[in-house]
A protein has these predicted regions:
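Gly/Pro-enriched, hydrophobic low-complexity segments
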Residues: 535, 598-681
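An aromatic/glycine/proline-enriched structural segment found at the starts
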Residues: 22-29, 218-283, 442, 448-472
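A structural supersecondary motif
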Residues: 276-278, 301-341
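M16/MPP (pitrilysin/insulinase) zinc-metallopeptidase core fold and M16-derived inactive scaffolds
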Residues: 64-126, 166, 186-190, 302-318
Length: 682
C-alpha cells in the first residue's frame, strides 16, 4: 500500500553529495621533514592524584580543558548501553543548575562543555575561563541524575537501536566486532532493547561514583595559561576532589583463527552487500609499528589514491569507495577493510580484497607509493596542529603510553625516515592473509554459495548473534499452500473475494512531520490512487489505471515507466494474494526464516517483467508479517483487526536504511467496497 509514498518520503530525506574532480597525475615530491614546534607540556600532580599537563600558547586568547579518565574497558553485559547515558545524565542538571541553565550559561559566553563516560572537556575565551571552570566543576561534582532524563534518553536509544537493526552498515559493524572479539568482550558486545531497559538511575550513579576519580584522571590544559596560573586554577577547582579505589579489569585476548571464516547476515531486500574484512592485531600507540602502520594504511586503503580504491572503484567499478584502517588500542587493535558493493559482484569484490591483502604482504609497497603516502600524512598531521583537542591528546598520549617527551615534535622526522623495508615488515607483522574474518550483510540467497569459496559461511542475525536454526519446511508444503493458508487465516476465500475495493486513510510521522496517506483500491477494475499530505497540503499523488501509471510530486507530474508500473502492480490490489495467479506472478517458497523472533515462510513473488518482492507468512498463524521490497525497504504488518469478516493489518511499520527512524503508519479510516467514480482516479 505504501510503496510509492515511501519513495516520496525517501526523496525528502536523501541528500546528494557532489565530489570535485582532482588532478592526481602530478604529485608533489616529498621534501625534508619540517621541525614541529608543538610546545612542551609542563606537568604537575595534585595530592589527590590528578595529573595535569599544561601546553601554553598565548597566540589566541583561548583556553581549553580536557579531562580524561584512564579506566580499563568495561564489559557492560545485561546493562549494555549504560555508559552511553552517563555524560548526558551528568549534564541534565546539578544541585545548583537545571539542564537549561547549564546550556544557557555555556552559550552566553560562547563556550563549549562536553561530558562522556570517560572524559570531560571545556573551552572558552580566556576572559571567561573562571565561568566555564565553575560550570565544569558543578557538573563534575554535583550531578543529580534526574529519572525523567534517563527515561527520555532510553527512549531515544531504543529508537536509534531500532533504526540500526535495519541499517546494513550498523549491522556490519556489530557483526564484525562480534566475530573478531566475541560477544563476551567489551569490544564485541551489543546494546539490546533488553539491556537498555535494564539500566536504572542507580546504575548511572554507581558508575559515576566508581570511575569519576582524580587518581585515574589526566587534565590537559592548552592555550593562554602558564603553569603557575594553572597550578592556582587547578587547585581551586579540582583540589578538593576526593580520590578512591577504582576496579581493574582484564580480558582474554581473542583466540586466533585457524583459517579464514565468513559471517553472513541475510537481508533479502538489500541490493548491495556491505563487506568487512577484519583481524585482531597487536598494535598500541608508540609501538615500533605504529607510525609505519599509518603509512601502510594510507597506501593500502587510506584514501582515493590507495590500492583498494584504485582497484575496486576506479578499475572494477564495484563500489563508490573501499577503505581500510589499522586501529591501535592498549587492549587489542584491529585491521579492517570494507566497502559496499552491488550484490552481483559480492564474491568478485571479496576476491579483490583478498588479492590486495596478499599482494601487500607478499610483494610489499613501492618507493613511489611510500613517498606519496608520506606527503599526504605530513599535510594531515600539520593541519591537526591547529586543533587544541589534538594538542591536548598529544600531551595525554605521552603520559598514557609512556612515549618520549619529543614523540610528536619528531613525529614527521620518524615518519620521513621510514623505508620501503620498514613498511613491508609492518605489513608482515600485522596481517595474516590466511586467518581473516570476512563479514557480509546482503541478500543471502544471491551471495551465500558464492562466498563459500573463501571459508566456512556462518549465519548471524542483525545483532551479531548466531542465526536461529529454523525448522525444515515440510516436504508437502508449497508456496501455493502458504498463500492458501494466509487467505484462510484472514477469513477465507469467500469473504476475501467479496472485497472489490477499499478507501483508507493512514496517519504517520517522520521526525516530527505528520503525514496523511489516502489510498483507493479498485480491485474490480485494477485501478489504484494514492495521495500523501504533509501538514494538510498535497505533496505527492500517484495513479495507476488502464495499465499505465502517473506520479506527481508537488505538482510536477511524470509518467511511470513500464518497469515502475510492473513493480507497482504488486500494491495495486487491496488483497494482492488473491490475484497472483491471474497476474502471471511466479511464486517460490524459500524456506522458513526468522522475522524478529517469529518463524515465517518466505515466499518470493516475481512479476512477468522480473521485478520481485519477498513476503513472509507466520508458520503459526498463517498471517503475513513482513514484506521486503528493494525500493521501499522492509514493511512489517501488525495489529490485525476484523473488518467485513476479513483480518486487516491496521499498522504497517516501514524500516529502511534511507529513513532515519522506522515509519509507523496506522489506518485511521477504512471503507470497504465504497462507491468509486472516475474522479477518484484523476
Amino acid at each position: 500500500m505504501l510503496k510509492i509514498t515511501i519513495s516520496f518520503v525517501l526523496s525528502l530525506l536523501v541528500s546528494v553529495a557532489s565530489f570535485a574532480q582532482v588532478d592526481r597525475s602530478q604529485f608533489p615530491k616529498a621534501g625534508p621533514a619540517p621541525v614541529i614546534k608543538i610546545g612542551e607540556a609542563e606537568t604537575f600532580t595534585l595530592a589527590n592524584g590528578l595529573k595535569v599537563f599544561v601546553v601554553e600558547n598565548d597566540k589566541l586568547p583561548r583556553v581549553s580543558f580536557t579531562l580524561v579518565f584512564e579506566r580499563d574497558p568495561l564489559f557492560e553485559g545485561d546493562k549494555a548501553g549504560l555508559t552511553g547515558f552517563v555524560g548526558q545524565m551528568m549534564k541534565a542538571g546539578t544541585t545548583n543548575r537545571t539542564k537549561d541553565q547549564i546550556d544557557e550559561e555555556v552559550d552566553f559566553i560562547g563556550a563549549n562543555l562536553g561530558v562522556s563516560s570517560t572524559s570531560m572537556s571545556a573551552s572558552s575565551l580566556k576572559k571567561h575561563q573562571g565561568k566555564i571552570l565553575d560550570l565544569m566543576a558543578d557538573v563534575l561534582y554535583n550531578p543529580i541524575f534526574p529519572e525523567e532524563e534517563l527515561e527520555k534518553l532510553k527512549k531515544q536509544s531504543l529508537t536509534g537501536l531500532a533504526t540500526s537493526k535495519d541499517d546494513p552498515n550498523s549491522i556490519s559493524r556489530r557483526l564484525s566486532s562480534a566475530m573478531v572479539y566475541g560477544k563476551d568482550h567489551p569490544y564485541g558486545e551489543s546494546t539490546t532493547a533488553e539491556s537498555i531497559g535494564n539500566v536504572t538511575v542507580e546504575d548511572v550513579k554507581s558508575y559515576y561514583n566508581t570511575f569519576f576519580k582524580p587518581n585515574i584522571a589526566y587534565l590537559a590544559i592548552v592555550g593562554d595559561m602558564s603553569k603557575s596560573e594553572a597550578e592556582q586554577v587547578v587547585k581551586k577547582y579540582f583540589g578538593e576532589w576526593k580520590p578512591g579505589d577504582v576496579p581493574k579489569f582484564t580480558y582474554d585476548t581473542p583466540d586466533p583463527l585457524a583459517k579464514t571464516v565468513v559471517g553472513l547476515v541475510d537481508r533479502s531486500s538489500s541490493v548491495q552487500t556491505v563487506i568487512d574484512i577484519a583481524q585482531p592485531i597487536d598494535l598500541t600507540v608508540g609501538d615500533e609499528d605504529y607510525i609505519s602502520s599509518r603509512v601502510l594504511n594510507q597506501i593500502f586503503g587510506g584514501g582515493s589514491s590507495s590500492r583498494l580504491f584504485t582497484n575496486l572503484r576506479e578499475d572494477k567499478g564495484y563500489t563508490y569507495g573501499a577503505y581500510s584502517s589499522f586501529s591501535a588500542d592498549k587492549l587489542i587493535g584491529e585491521f579492517s577493510a570494507s566497502a559496499s558493493v552491488r550484490t552481483e559482484v559480492t564474491d568478485s569484490a571479496v576476491y579483490e580484497f583478498i588479492y590486495e591483502i596478499n599482494r601487500l604482504v607478499e610483494d610489499g609497497v613501492t618507493q613511489e607509493e611510500l613517498d606519496k603516502a608520506k606527503a599526504n600524512l605530513a599535510g594531515s598531521f600539520g593541519r591537526s596542529l591547529e586543533s587544541p583537542a589534538a594538542i591536548a591528546s598529544f600531551a595525554l598520549n605521552i603520559e598514557r603510553y609512556d612515549l618520549p617527551k619529543d614523540y610528536y615534535e619528531t613525529y614527521l622526522q620518524k615518519m620521513n625516515a621510514l623505508t620501503v623495508a620498514d613498511i613491508n615488515r609492518t605489513a608482515d607483522d600485522l596481517i595474516d592473509p590466511s586467518k581473516l574474518y570476512i563479514t557480509a550483510v546482503g541478500n543471502g540467497a544471491e551471495i551465500k554459495d558464492k562466498l563459500a569459496q573463501f571459508g566456512e559461511v556462518l549465519m548471524f542475525d542483525n545483532m551479531g548473534y548466531p542465526a536461529k536454526e529454523m525448522e525444515a519446511v515440510d516436504a508437502d508444503m508449497t508456496s501455493e499452500k502458504v498463500i492458501d493458508n494466509y487467505i484462510a487465516a484472514i477469513g477465507g476465500m469467500d469473504k476475501a473475494q467479496a472485497i472489490k475495493g477499499a478507501k483508507l486513510e493512514m496517519a504517520a510521522e517522520v521526525m516530527g512531520t505528520k503525514l496523511t496517506i489516502e489510498l483507493i483500491h479498485d480491485d474490480a477494475n485494477m485501478r489504484f490512487a494514492q495521495k500523501t499530505l504533509v501538514g494538510g497540503n498535497v505533496m505527492q499523488t500517484s495513479v495507476i489505471k488502464d495499465g499505465k501509471g502517473t506520479a506527481s510530486v508537488q505538482g510536477q507530474s511524470m509518467p511511470m515507466s513500464d518497469e515502475q508500473v510492473d513493480a507497482a502492480k504488486l500494491s495495486t490490489y487491496f488483497l494482492p494474494e488473491l490475484h497472483y495467479e491471474s497476474m502471471g506472478y511466479t511464486l517460490t517458497l524459500d524456506g522458513i526464516k526468522d522475522v524478529e523472533g517469529t518463524p515465517a515462510y518466505k515466499v518470493i513473488v516475481a512479476t512477468p517483467l522480473g521485478s520481485s518482492v519477498n513476503n513472509y507468512y507466520s508458520v503459526e498463524t498463517g498471517l503475513k508479517v513482513k514484506n521486503e521490497n528493494p525500493v521501499s525497504g522492509d514493511t512489517f504488518y501488525s495489529d490485525y483487526q476484523e473488518k467485513n469478516g476479513v483480518l486487516i493489518p491496521m499498522t504497517q511499520t516501514i524500516k529502511s536504511a534511507m529513513i532515519p527512524v522506522p515509519l509507523e503508519a496506522k489506518i485511521t479510516k477504512l471503507e470497504i467496497n465504497p462507491e468509486l467514480t472516475e474522479a477518484d482516479f484523476n
